[in-house]
């Protein structure tokens, strides 16, 4: 098992690395040339800038049983299609049971924005320590579940 993080503007990289290190699981952070990262623990892969370049690279290297951390529903759907696990930075698990509805809602919201002429959305609220703790707990559960299924 390996952990892959869609790391462009991802607020939980530190938590992912800490938890992964506690379980001796390797982590790969993927980012584009606009968000270059460095890490003492993780492998960092920098992908050329371009729409979805990081997403396609991540999906090309993840495998069955790996864990993908991403806020992108499309990446999550492709990871699930490869029988990998996927988790949002909020701690919500993407599953085969919920991904279709999430993708449909994203599509309908995009359509509504186009129709109304509103293309700029308000950003997410400021992240709290409770958000971080919720993600850590959910991520830990996912790791344990994946490890149990691996054995």
Model feature map: region roles:
Residues 2-151:
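Nuclease catalytic cores that cleave nucleic-acid phosphodiester bonds
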